[in-house]
Swiss-Prot record:
The gene is dxr. This is 1-deoxy-D-xylulose 5-phosphate reductoisomerase. NCBIfam families: Dxr (TIGR00243), PRK05447.1-1 (NF003938), PRK12464.1 (NF009114). Keywords: Isoprene biosynthesis, Manganese, Metal-binding, NADP, Oxidoreductase. Belongs to the DXR family.
Amino acid sequence: MQQITILGSTGSVGVSTLDVIARHPDRYSVYALTAQSKVEELAQQCARFKPQVAVVGSAEAAKKLQVLLDAQGLHTQVGYGEAALCAVASAPECDSVMAAIVGAAGLAPTLAAARSGKRVLLANKEALVMSGPLLMEAVAASGAILMPIDSEHNAIFQCMPATCQRTPLAHGVEKILLTASGGPFLKRDVNTLDQVSWQEAVAHPKWVMGRKISVDSATMMNKGLEVIEAHWLFDLPAERIEVVIHPQSVVHSMVSYVDGSVLAQLGNPDMRTPIAHALAYPERISSGVPPIDLIQIAQLSFERPDFLRFPCLKLAYDALQAGGSAPAIMNAANEIAVQAFLDSRIGFRAIDQLIARVMDVMPSVAITDIESVFAQDRCARELANSFIPS
């Protein structure tokens, strides 16, 4: 029986993970669930899955959760804050950790899980974007297993033999191709993009996701973050990581080899597929996702992304090339910009402009430890906030 900690259990990936776990009660049980502020939803999850521990973001939320659990006669231990998150991520009772907290908040517990030698199911791409060398060093030192959950990276993982994933160029890999739907504004007149509302931006044509990642998809910053993530996961330089727009979202990514072969992973756009793969690897289990019907789909199309339409993608490539703290700076500025857009404080096209301005002002420095990462993150956030009109 595998004991699972789910960091971010009330988010879309967390909910999908619980759906897969519920289908296999003979294989998996829940050790801990965490949420920032969705206390009622977390209490419902605790009632169903009966974790040993539940963690929330604040003391106030913890008190509220405790009342709800007591009313149901549940004996789940309640904690709050970053230290409690790190504790459930590294607990000896836990075998695997689903790292699904969105943004920089997920970095510390993800690192704690890696340092403790867990099987880390990585849905929090920001952990690698902000501190790629630190996380990969922790995995190597502890013997942790890092399983990508993003559908694109999970697809690459499935298309590349395990024996060559850390040295792909030496094993005949020419490049990897990360597919992107193009989001809701792929065909919209570029000159009208500053007029779009956040409600339009979060209406993804293929995937059901949270608001922040949906906006990232609309700007293609999400794909930019995935380029940086792929660099660390598969040890490939930026020029060997190509982004291809694929509106049908059926081909999740591809690996091109020097002999002319291209291997692709196909499937319906449902996060339960990569979650089930990562939970059971190297075995296979049912995810609840039906197989694709290629006859019904009939056509698959691909095109190159336009950096004029998607400047955030170019910013991510620039950050990867700059190295050091540049990706962390970019990520912090993006989180501030996206939240400002969701709060209707800036327009859609101001997102990339704000990020570029922060990246221009803040020089990249070496990343030596988690404290230096957080210092750069804080500075970039303060700078980004100072650029937003009051």
